[in-house]
Amino acid sequence: VQGGDWGATISKWMAELYPDHCIGIHLNMIIAWPPVDKDPLENTSQEEQKLMANYEKYKEQGVGYYEIQKTKPQTLGYGLNDSPVGLAAWIVEKFYGWFDGEENKLVVSNDEVLAIVSLYWFSESITSSTRLYKENGDLGFSFENIKQPMAGAVFERDLIAPPRAWAEEIYNVVQWNTHKGGHFAALEQPESLSADIIDFIKKLNIV
């Protein structure tokens, strides 16, 4: 399985719940926290500590959307589902802030942005997508160890970029690479992401 953002959480659940059917897990947003009984900076490099600073900035300036979607998704949904401009503003703001681009500059085309906004608008699915934060967020994150091989593709400007030592507390890490790019890796750096996935598949000897 492969995933980033919510896909990373879902991928972990799949690996945990269906170990006989999931032979490997590749993540491009690795969710991991420091071990409670160790120095959180133990076995971390200076470069990894620098990447961790992105998360601190995100916590200070970027989690407003998360708190709203986690606590009042239905209220938010009425407004976004009623206004294409409001919906576009809610989504496009993330594209500006979460890509590895210069300030106030998109790194994907307007056509790609409009296609994504249109997906939510014409299907009227923005409300159900925000409810995901409420309905699944209440469950919390599972810290059960994953025995299947795991590959981490860390993109330097992602919202969460924990050090490998943290990930190894939960996952069976067999591959760990750092790439240029931000949160939406598949849009921004498709070549880097796909090459990382292919390298992992080769390690699993399934092709």
Set out the residue ranges of the language-model regions.
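Generic detector of intrinsically disordered, low-complexity, polar/charged segments
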Residues: 1-4, 21, 61, 76, ...
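Conserved hydrolase catalytic core segment
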Residues: 1-50
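Extended alpha-helical regions
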Residues: 11, 28, 55, 61-62, ...
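The feature captures the conserved acid-bearing segment of alpha/beta-hydrolase catalytic domains
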Residues: 41-72, 142-145, 168
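C-terminal subdomain of alpha/beta-hydrolase-fold enzymes, centered on the catalytic histidine
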Residues: 69-207
